[in-house]
Amino acid sequence: MRSKSKQVLLLWLEGFREACSLHRVVILCLRSRKLLLRTGQCFLLNGLIFLGSLGVFKWFIDPSLQWILPDQCSPLTSQEFCSYGGFYAFLRGGLLQLFYVFWFYPLYMLSFILSNIWYNDIAKHGFEAIEISDLNSAEALRQGEALASLNMANAERPSGLGGVMIGIGEQVYSILLLTFFFLEVCVVGVIPYIGKILNFLLLSWMYAYYCYEYKWNFSGISLKKRLDFFQSNWAFFAGFGSPCVLAIFFLSPLVSGALMAILFPLFVLTATGSGPEKLIGAPRRTWKCAGLGKLPIFYIADTLSMLALSIFRLESPHEN
């Protein structure tokens, strides 16, 4: 038991350290001008415009409205002016809501849509920068050897139309799985006493999976292999996702969304440049153990996804 606990802690710390290896982002951006451009666009939209707008609102607009339309009277204010305090509070609240409805919420949606498009480009350019670079050939060889066992999935997938259909099916299932897992994360957060702890843990796994999914997509690793590898090495990925969650866990939804939109591509690039297969295998060789065992992280999401797909299959013939 003590040996297992040490293994969990070491793998968690290894994952945490990998996520914090942000120097890889600088190296990859220096190798690829396209990557630097996309990353800069992401920082401009989410950092300067989105997060900057929230800062201007909090530190300038809101205090100014508090001063112009106060809801409490100072001793020097006339009684006639004070009689409008309730109306001023209502008017100020309405103006604040207008800012949210016509600026922050549309900006949030724009950021969400563009960022998701840019994230894929960032991961692709980062992956290409690693592949074509000969400045770090030893690292490329190390990752190539580590991914060899996982890339065996490519041989199992048929070519032609059959392979395309399997790929589409995997994408549909993956979307359903991650959607239900996200809902599970939200529901777990309202559980008394232990809800916040479970929410933090599930969020860590969710962000870690998102970060590595880009790399696995470009590596051609099948969905089954990804899920098996992820759930078999849950301690490492819990550690990798922890810095992502720590950065936003105690912030308001809009601020956390803006900050995560800035940080997420950095963690994606960190995941793209990392080799978790060898990092995870090192402790096993040191302790001569088989690993921690598979943890069914996606069990609930998988059950709901299969249920949704079975309902869809039953309804389709009936409609025809």
Swiss-Prot record:
GO cellular component terms, semicolon-separated: membrane
Top-level taxonomic group: Eukaryota
Primary residence: membrane
TM segment ranges: 41-61, 94-114, 175-195, 227-247, 248-268, 292-312
Keyword terms: Glycoprotein, Membrane, Transmembrane, Transmembrane helix
Pfam families hit by this protein: EI24 (PF07264)
Family affiliation: Belongs to the EI24 (TC 9.B.7) family.
Protein name: Protein EI24 homolog
Species this chain originates from: Arabidopsis thaliana (Mouse-ear cress)
